[in-house]
Structures are given as structure tokens and as C-alpha cells.
Amino acid sequence: MSVLIIAGLDSSTGAGLARDLAVMAELGLPARIAATAVTAQDSAGGCLLHPVPAAMVAAQIHAAGPVRAAKLGMLADAEIVAAVADSLPPVPTVLDPVLATSAGVGLIDAAGLAAMIALLFPRATLITPNLPEAALLTGLPEATAPDRLAAALFARGARAVLLKGGHGKGAEAVDWLCRPDAPALRLASPRKPGTKRGTGCTLASAIAGHLALGADLPTACARAKAHLDGWL
């Protein structure tokens, strides 16, 4: 029943592997990890990033043994992306396309981003971009309608997209689960005041956890949204 978490280590423990592991503990699921990078992050938004060698990332994935689902977070560069693509087991996989810290510090280079789209979008069961990430991935404005953003991501190889609305406006935080062969599913919760790090990690890990528990994709997304709302 283990879930494989492939992500970076955030020294502040506010996001990344620490947050992913906390979610697995909350769900009562064992986890296996593959660290892609070590970061030094502080409360002022500073971030130093040291990628783990791609061969070591692959070795960690192979050492994990059998798992029921996987969650991918920060991947740092093209060599790591390629190692993950070559080593990833054939299980339901949630890709959180982490592009930058909450303070705007980049966490993947241009070659890594291109490799992520080419190698991992077609492999992932679901990708979970927020609105700024969806805009960067598609070249469209953040205000573009969800169905158009999703269509542009499908054209780049994505199989299913959860567009996260936490960066939007209004009384509700609205996420849209979009699939090429089904109507879009609206998932809404009351918008909480302020900001909190680790929301994307929490949601993606919770989805992966519920997929490991046997839920279908819409159910896993709905349960994960409720889990995130409870944490906030």
C-alpha cells in the first residue's frame, strides 16, 4: 500500500518531502521517498538549491520496491526528469509541476521544464498546476477559461488536469478536474484568508494517497480537496 514520493527536501519543512510525508501519515499510509534536491529555505523567501545526482535519484526509486501510487514534485533539471521517467513504476502517478517557490525562486531550469512536458506529462495519471503554473506551461493568460487551459495542457501530452484555483479571487477556491473524455468537475471550498506554504504538496500527495487506497480519480480529487481544506 506504499506511496512513492519523488520530491525535494525543504529545510523549513513547510513544503516538499516533509509535507508529503505528513500527508501520508495523516492518511495512515506508508511512504517511500526519492529526494531530487536539497534546499536551504528561510522565512524571508530565500532559497538555495542543490540537485541530487540523477543516478542517485534513480537508485532511490529502484530501492523503493513495490508501491501502489506515486507523487512527483520538484524535479530540478532535465537529467533528473529523465531518470525519473526511466525509473518510474507503472502505477497511478500525480505530477505537481513545481516551477518556483512561493516567493518566486525558480526550482527547475528551462531544459528540465521541456523534459517534464515531453517525458512525464504523457506518463502521469494527473497533473496539478495552479493558475500561474498553467499559464507558464501553456503561454496563456492566467485568466483564460479552465477548459481552454486544460485543452492546451492536453495538447502538450497531459492525460488529466486538476487546475487549482487557490491563486484566484472570490469567496471560493475553485479547482477544476478536466479530462478529455468527461465533463469538467468543479471542486470548491471556502477561500481561507492569508497564504500558507505547502498547499500544492498537500493536495497532490493526498490525491496520490487516495489513488493508492483504490479511489477513482474524481473521488480521490474530492477527498484530497477536503483534506486540504481541513489542514488549512
Give the role of each language-model region.
Residues 79-92, 159, 180-184, 194, ...:
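Nucleotide and nucleotide-moiety/phosphate-recognizing core
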Residues 146-154, 216-231:
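Short, well-structured alpha-helical segments that form the helix of a local strand-helix-strand
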Residues 6-12, 184-198:
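Short pre-catalytic strand/loop immediately N-terminal to key active-site residues, enriched for Gly-Thr
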Residues 1-5, 17-102:
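Conserved N-terminal subdomain of the carbohydrate kinase-like
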Residues 45-52, 105-110, 139-142, 192:
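Short glycine-enriched, charge-decorated loop/helix-capping segments at active-site entrances
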Residues 108-184:
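Conserved phosphate/ATP/ADP-binding segment of small-molecule kinases
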Residues 28-32, 183-185, 210-225:
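Phosphate-handling active-site elements
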Residues 23, 135-136, 194-217, 221:
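Short, small-residue alpha-helix embedded
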